[in-house]
Amino acid sequence: MSSISDSFTRINFLYNINDLKNLISIFEYGILSKNSLIKKGIKNYTDLSNPDVQERRNNIRVPNHGFLHDYANLYIDARNPMMYFEINNKNINELCVICVDKKILDLENVVITDRNAATELAQFDEPENALRFLDFDSIFAKSWNHPIPYIKNELKAKKCAEVLVLDKIPVNYLIKIKVATQLAKENVEQLQLNVPIEIDKDIFFQ
């Protein structure tokens, strides 16, 4: 019997962009939502997100339940505007992408958005209904540049289509880690997380 995740044939993994310093915590507790981090009292967590964006996300209600900060978020494609921002504002040796099994889509309390969840036009729905609005050609496009500003903004938002998982993404769904450099790979290897680590320059715009 096929599962919901099987219908997402264009997706191999889902992705979480993170800081290497968070990996020990992540592989102990899972990828936690902002509010779950607070509840667990985890304070030594390096937050990559823009504070202004997070303030906006904190007030956005998810139709199914709660607010965006109640959900751990994943991207359908990690080679996106957030990644582009991070590589231009942070040491690339400190960045990683955690590849998450798409079977996470089969769990309850999972929501998919057709674009950055913090944008006004974002559509939210359960995985079984989300294929109707996902624009995979835009999500997986190599570029979101366009001479017409409003189209560029639309493409940029769609590149950041999200999968939202209530509270946390369990450790057993974390499949492998991607990094940009040999140095980053060696630093992750020292953590002994027992998952494959690979260098993927393309996902980091290298």
Name the predicted role of every residue range.
Residues 1-206:
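Active-site-proximal loop/hinge segments that shape catalytic or ion-binding/gating pockets
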